[in-house]
C-alpha cells in the first residue's frame, strides 16, 4: 500500500473505534461522505468533442470525520476533517494534502455563537452559496462561468479564525480572518471575509464580502504557503489577472419557496486589483447576474434551471468587453434517502475579448466554459455544451 492509503485506513479505523467509546463522555465522532460519478459529454473541449468519466458533480466525492463533545452549559467542542478524492482513480483531490477540503476545531455555544480555527470555507461562501445556482444545479454546470465569484466550493482558507453569531430573529452574522504567514509582510497572503444571512419561513437572503491578498510572490494566489492555499479558481476567464495584488468579491442572493417551487436571484461583483508587479494596469471587474427556479414534481423527482450573465469590464486594452451567457438544467431522481440519479445539461455562449495568460498586451477572444467543469478546457468556438448523467451515494 502507498503511504496515503495507509493514512486513510488508519483514520477510518480510528473513527470507528472512537465512535464506539465516545458515548461515555457524551461525545460523538461520525464518519461521513459522498461517492459521485458520471459519464460526461462536451461538444468542444479545446477543439474536440469528448466523452469521459467525471466524478464529483452533484456532490464532490469525499469523506470526513465530524466530532462533537458536550462540555456542559450549552458549550460543545467540535471538529471537522474532510478529504476529497477522485473516484475514478482513487487519487487524493490535492496531492500532499489529506484534508484538503476543510480541517478545523472550535467551540460552539447556544448563547454566544461559534468560534473555529483551521482550514475553512469562507462566510462569503457558506452564507451566500446555498442561495446561488451552484447549490441548486451543481457547481459542475450550475456555477457561474469559471466560478468567477467563488460561490461554488473553490476557495478554502488556511490559518483562519471564524466567528459565527447565534441566530436572532432569523439573522445570523459571521466573520473570518486568515493570517498570511509571511514574515515581515502581514498585509500579504491574508484573507478577510464577512457575511450576513436572514432566513425566515419561505424567505432566505444573504450577502457576503471576501478579500484575498496575494502573497506577492510569482505564485500569487496559487502560493500554497498563504491563506488561500492554491484553492483559488483559475480559468480562461481570470487567467490574465492572476498577478493582481488582491481580489475582492461581493455577492448577494436570495430564495423564495412557495410549496414545491423555489425561485431565486443572485448578483456578484468581482474585482482584480493591480499592484506594482501585476501584468495588467487597470482594475478588472466581473459583474454577474443570475436567476434560478426549482420544482419538486414528486417526493423523489425534481427539476431545476438557471440563467447567468457575466459582463467583464472594458480595460487593459480590451476594446470589446467579454460577455458570458449560461443556461443550465438539472434533473434528479432519488432512489432512497442516500442514493440519487441525476442528469445535467448546460450551454455557455461568449462574446468580446479578454486578457490571455500573459496579461496586458495579450488580448484574446473570450472563450466559453460551462460552470467550473471546464476551467482550462474551453471551446474553440463561441459556444460550449456539457451533458452529464450520473449517480451519487451519501453515507
Task: Cite the ranges covered by each PLM segment.
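Outer membrane beta-barrel
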Residues: 26-41, 52-183, 188-211, 346-350
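Outer-membrane beta-barrel and related beta-rich outer-membrane complex signature
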Residues: 45, 91-93, 127-133, 217-221, ...
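Outer-membrane beta-barrel "beta-signal"
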Residues: 335, 379-395
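Detector for outer-membrane/organellar transmembrane beta-barrel domains
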Residues: 195-334, 345-347, 382
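Outer-membrane beta-barrel proteins
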Residues: 16-22, 63-71, 109-113, 166-169, ...
Amino acid at each position: 500500500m502507498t503511504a496515503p492509503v495507509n493514512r486513510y485506513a488508519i483514520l477510518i479505523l480510528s473513527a470507528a473505534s472512537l465512535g464506539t467509546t465516545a458515548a461515555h463522555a457524551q461525545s460523538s465522532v461520525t464518519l461521513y461522505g459522498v461517492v459521485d460519478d458520471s459519464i460526461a459529454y462536451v461538444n468542444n473541449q479545446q477543439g474536440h468533442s469528448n466523452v469521459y468519466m467525471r466524478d464529483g458533480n452533484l456532490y464532490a466525492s469525499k469523506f470526513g470525520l465530524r466530532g462533537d463533545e458536550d462540555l456542559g452549559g450549552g458549550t460543545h467542542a467540535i471538529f471537522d476533517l474532510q478529504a476529497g478524492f477522485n473516484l475514478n482513480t482513487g487519487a487524493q483531490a490535492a496531492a500532499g494534502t489529506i484534508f484538503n477540503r476543510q480541517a478545523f476545531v472550535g467551540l460552539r455555544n447556544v448563547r454566544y455563537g461559534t468560534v473555529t480555527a483551521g482550514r475553512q470555507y469562507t462566510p462569503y461562501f457558506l452564507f451566500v452559496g446555498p442561495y446561488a445556482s451552484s447549490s441548486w444545479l451543481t457547481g459542475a454546470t450550475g456555477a457561474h462561468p469559471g466560478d468567477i465569484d467563488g460561490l461554488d466550493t473553490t476557495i478554502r482558507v488556511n490559518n483562519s479564525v471564524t466567528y459565527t453569531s447565534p441566530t436572532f430573529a432569523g439573522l445570523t452574522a459571521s466573520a473570518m480572518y486568515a493570517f498570511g504567514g509571511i514574515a515581515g509582510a502581514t498585509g500579504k497572503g491574508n484573507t478577510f471575509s464577512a457575511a450576513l444571512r436572514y432566513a425566515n419561513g419561505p424567505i432566505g437572503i444573504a450577502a457576503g464580502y471576501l478579500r484575498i491578498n496575494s502573497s506577492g510572490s510569482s505564485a500569487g494566489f496559487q502560493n500554497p504557503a498563504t491563506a488561500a492555499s492554491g484553492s483559488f479558481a483559475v480559468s480562461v476567464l481570470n487567467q490574465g489577472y492572476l498577478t493582481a495584488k488582491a481580489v475582492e468579491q461581493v455577492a448577494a442572493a436570495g430564495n423564495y419557496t412557495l410549496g414545491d417551487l423555489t425561485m431565486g436571484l443572485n448578483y456578484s461583483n468581482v474585482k482584480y486589483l493591480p499592484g506594482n508587479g501585476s501584468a495588467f494596469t487597470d482594475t478588472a471587474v466581473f459583474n454577474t447576474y443570475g436567476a434560478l427556479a426549482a420544482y419538486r414534481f414528486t417526493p423523489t423527482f425534481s427539476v431545476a434551471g438557471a440563467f447567468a450573465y457575466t459582463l467583464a469590464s472594458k480595460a487593459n486594452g480590451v476594446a470589446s468587453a467579454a460577455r458570458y451567457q449560461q443556461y443550465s438544467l438539472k434533473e434528479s431522481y432519488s432512489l432512497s434517502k442516500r442514493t440519487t440519479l441525476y442528469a445535467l445539461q448546460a450551454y455557455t455562449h461568449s462574446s468580446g475579448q479578454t486578457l490571455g495568460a500573459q496579461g496586458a498586451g495579450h488580448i484574446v477572444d473570450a472563450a466559453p466554459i460551462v460552470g467550473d467543469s471546464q476551467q482550462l478546457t474551453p471551446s474553440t468556438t463561441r459556444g460550449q455544451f456539457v451533458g452529464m448523467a450520473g449517480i451519487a451515494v451519501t453515507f
